Amino acid sequence: RERTSATTVLTLYYQLGQTDPTHSLFSYAAREIPASVRELIDVVGLSVYPQLHPMGTAADRVLSTLDAAFSSSRIAVTELGYGGQDLNAGPWWFGSASDPVAARTAVAEHVTGAALGRSDAWGAPFWWYYLEDQVGTPGGQVAPALAAVSTGC
């Protein structure tokens, strides 16, 4: 627990619908991450898999709540994915229930846009299944959607 010159990133898994507010991501972080650790964290990110835990229109609110909880750190979506083979059983769809390309594009545009639209944004999300999604698994390439969102083109 010593400060270094390296950027220190903490990633928390976004999970929807905990039994009650005391078990939410934010309650957990407040309870389990002491100030001595918080002061060492440069960036707090969320791991987001909307197929399992949808964020939808709450993306800005969730990121704002994370920002308030970690006010001395920058906020990011540090992990993002949709439609990976181990996620296909997820109960939620985003953008399209039947077209994985449209669904991934919608996820990339919405969540990346919400993350990068913040004044204190720290980079674009890391698309977890990038290689698989880019080289032709069901759902096609994700790079064009990510590039368009990150450059605004």
What are these regions (language model features)?
Residues 22-32, 57-65, 100-114, 145:
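Well-ordered, non-membrane alpha-helical segments in soluble/globular domains
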Residues 2, 30-39, 65-70, 115-120:
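Acidic (Asp/Glu)-rich catalytic clusters
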Residues 17-18, 34-37, 67, 100, ...:
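Short, structured coil/loop segments at alpha-helix boundaries
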Residues 4-8, 40-42, 71-74, 120-124:
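Short, well-ordered coil/turn segments that N-cap beta-strands
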Residues 13, 26-28, 70, 92-94, ...:
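Phenylalanine-focused residue identity feature
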Residues 3-7, 11-22:
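Active-site mouth of glycoside hydrolases
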Residues 49-51, 74-153:
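Substrate-binding cleft of secreted/luminal carbohydrate-active enzymes
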Residues 10-14, 25-57, 62-63, 73-86:
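Aromatic- and acid-rich polysaccharide-binding/catalytic face
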